Amino acid sequence: MRIGFLGFGKSNRSLLKYLLKHQEAKFFVSEAKTLDGETKKFLEEHSVEYEEGGHTEKLLECDVVYVSPGIKPDTSMIELLSSRGAKLSTELQFFLDNVDPKKVVGITGTDGKSTATALMHHVLSERGFKSFLGGNFGTPAVEALEGEYDYYVLEMSSFQLFWSERPYLSNFLVLNISEDHLDWHSSFEEYVDSKLKPVFLQTEGDLFVYNKHIERLKDLEGVRSRKIPFWTDENFATEKELIVRGKRYTLPGNYPYQMRENVLAVSVLYMEMFNELESFLELLRDFKPLPHRMEYLGQIDGRHFYNDSKATSTHAVLGALSNFDKVVLIMCGIGKKENYSLFVEKASPKLKHLIMFGEISKELAPFVGKIPHSIVENMEEAFEKAMEVSEKGDVILLSPGGASFDMYENYAKRGEHFREIFKRHGGDEV
């Protein structure tokens, strides 16, 4: 058997390492970029054939090709493989095919999925279960096959689900869906269909927890699993309370809107799995939210600073704005072909001043109209401008609405840079 790897990112690296231990086969790695010396040494030591700097028709000789999730469907090699009837799969699909589905909890959504996944892992672990945290969240799922776990809590991206041919999940949570990654997917419909692929594979006895406001899920005819919506009269959250199965519980802290939605969604999932919520609320007290997600940094001269660098879509930005009355908003990064006219219409009542830099400024600028705004060159200038146009009591919010890759390695580096500038200006950290 000959197994190919199209792209050699984190997930395919982990899969190859697993297969080298557990499967007799010939392996072939095809990477568009240049491989580093350490990677080449590893491949050569294990007699793995490889090519770099582009893809060739050698992949056609493989019985199955595992696709790195980030590779776009319209790349020429994908089109060639598809036209020749090649079998395409993913590291995620390999994992799902080799594990008890009842132990897997899959979580997806446009915004909040990393936090929700981390929260579910936290409450399961603290309850005494051996829980694996991974998927799109850090560790590739296939690495869990080397151990024994009670639960596998996986964050799942639209890219992973798109390339996985049959991602069956016994427990599936969908937080929300809005326009995102339209620079990757051919349409919003394709993006939604990718996110929801597991729903239509579920059978009786499986669990599906979902946001009632997702338009595509208004008609669930043909879905055979147990369907539990939230943001309903039975399951919803206020600033201070959590209502699950119609029963009221006091939230153990003050949470911004997106975190409240995460807590609500995971609490409904937890209730359906364990039929009680008291232990969840106790364990929630000790959960530390992930950085760069509505992270309160502190004050400078009475101004309040929030780092929401993980907000890479306009839907996420609107969620952040919903927590405040008026905001000095910093947006930056690479946009995702969203409806910016609609975004500005919804955001404008919350904006005291909009500061933009990076590629997204070109896409936003035509729609800002009479909203006070500034276009600057970088984060330092954005920070200085925010101080200039704000006054004591104002909120200064970094919520970019775009991917970080035009100027930063990732969203975390972008958020850390914002925090560094905050400290440099004498920020009074919490």
UniProtKB/Swiss-Prot annotation:
TM annotation in the entry: none
Residues binding ATP: 109-115
Alphabetical list of Pfam families matching this protein: Mur_ligase_C (PF02875), Mur_ligase_M (PF08245), MurD-like_N (PF21799), MurD_N (PF21377)
Coiled-coil region list: none
Pathway: Cell wall biogenesis; peptidoglycan biosynthesis
GO cellular component, one term: cytoplasm
Enzyme Commission designation: 6.3.2.9
MF GO annotations: ATP binding; UDP-N-acetylmuramoylalanine-D-glutamate ligase activity
The keyword Transcription regulation is assigned to this record: no
GO terms, biological process: cell division; cell wall organization; peptidoglycan biosynthetic process; regulation of cell shape
Catalysed reaction equations from the record: UDP-N-acetyl-alpha-D-muramoyl-L-alanine + D-glutamate + ATP = UDP-N-acetyl-alpha-D-muramoyl-L-alanyl-D-glutamate + ADP + phosphate + H(+)
Keywords: ATP-binding, Cell cycle, Cell division, Cell shape, Cell wall biogenesis/degradation, Cytoplasm, Ligase, Nucleotide-binding, Peptidoglycan synthesis
Location relative to the cell: Cytoplasm
Main subcellular localisation: cytoplasm
Principal EC category: ligase
Kinase as UniProt keyword: no
Annotated InterPro entries: Mur-like_cat_sf (IPR036565), Mur_ligase_C (IPR004101), Mur_ligase_C_dom_sf (IPR036615), Mur_ligase_cen (IPR013221), MurD (IPR005762)
UniProt family annotation: Belongs to the MurCDEF family.
Function per UniProt: Cell wall formation. Catalyzes the addition of glutamate to the nucleotide precursor UDP-N-acetylmuramoyl-L-alanine (UMA).
UniProt-recorded name of the protein: UDP-N-acetylmuramoylalanine--D-glutamate ligase
Gene that this polypeptide is encoded by: murD
